[in-house]
Swiss-Prot record:
Residues 1-19 form the signal peptide. Residues 404-431 form a propeptide. SMART domains: GDNF. It comes from Gallus gallus. It is a lipid-anchor; GPI-anchor. This is GDNF family receptor alpha-4.
Amino acid sequence: MRGILYFCTLILLEGMAEAVSSSRDCLQAGESCTNDPICSSKFRTLRQCIAGNGANKLGPDAKNQCRSTVTALLSSQLYGCKCKRGMKKEKHCLSVYWSIHHTLMEGMNVLESSPYEPFIRGFDYVRLASITAGSENEVTQVNRCLDAAKACNVDEMCQRLRTEYVSFCIRRLARADTCNRSKCHKALRKFFDRVPPEYTHELLFCPCEDTACAERRRQTIVPACSYESKEKPNCLAPLDSCRENYVCRSRYAEFQFNCQPSLQTASGCRRDSYAACLLAYTGIIGSPITPNYIDNSTSSIAPWCTCNASGNRQEECESFLHLFTDNVCLQNAIQAFGNGTYLNAATAPSISPTTQMYKQERNANRAAATLSENIFEHLQPTKVAGEERLLRGSTRLSSETSSPAAPCHQAASLLQLWLPPTLAVLSHFMM
């Protein structure tokens, strides 16, 4: 009965997610904007504003003009557009997204939106239901990590892409005792983007009770090439490198968004979705900030870096590192996957809150409030009187593009109102 209810819940969630994610993607929005003289002109201006991070070097007048441009584009088809993870021309799509959001989000450590559509990928419902249907004892009595490897070898795509990334990651460069990390990372991203989660999640998050199992799990991403190096760099180096790349910046933003910890929810996740958190986690594997299990004796996860010698960016560095090492949402999601309850996030967190988690909660709330003020400050009539001409110029854009998007926003609102009670009822029957 429990497995059947999970099965029904998954189908329901995917159907609703697809309905909500039917909004315009940023590639389409960019093409529409290019074909509109008014939008196209403002978009070119915005590109100039953020070129080479030049916004920090602009004078007051130039900054005001850039703010005016952003304000006008808030009512265009560009604002609110999303991208799909692993889509064709993903980098191009994300460049359009960040052209708008780079300005709005500048200085924010915690993002209040994800560049990607809230899409639940095609899970194998029968397989997942069978895994989660048994009791916790039944799940942990078998070697799930070994079973995961066997299951991947049976599936053609999983076996082929796994063999491909392992081949790239273990291959040594000629006349050097190092691997080609760039090719290794690219092959890893391809694997986690294309192979269904019922295989990738089982390989990464399988529960272990002995070191042999835990070592197999740790070796999943071939850490000698994809993760480790002779010395641990300061975390700010890979973080800065990530922010300079559209794809990595977006995957990290999705991870922040979907794995954001909270002390206000029973699950420990602000978004109350373990599945979304785990999927976001797999998205940053194969990036400059690739995380992994730190050893074969625990389930602790961290990127390969340290916050020593961070200077005046010490707090920023520690906030980044603690998103992995002290994140109740991520830790609970991994544990819930192990005992077969990760599809039902409405369970009490098994990890006690720490001082750092309280600090993360305060920072998240502060960032959310500041972000809201920054965006809507530009929209107050008393503050945009001088920009009336620009806003008038965008009237046609607003009337043409805001209406089609309205059903998507309404659907999202209805989903937020309807989904929690529905899951609560389902979880009641699963007990």
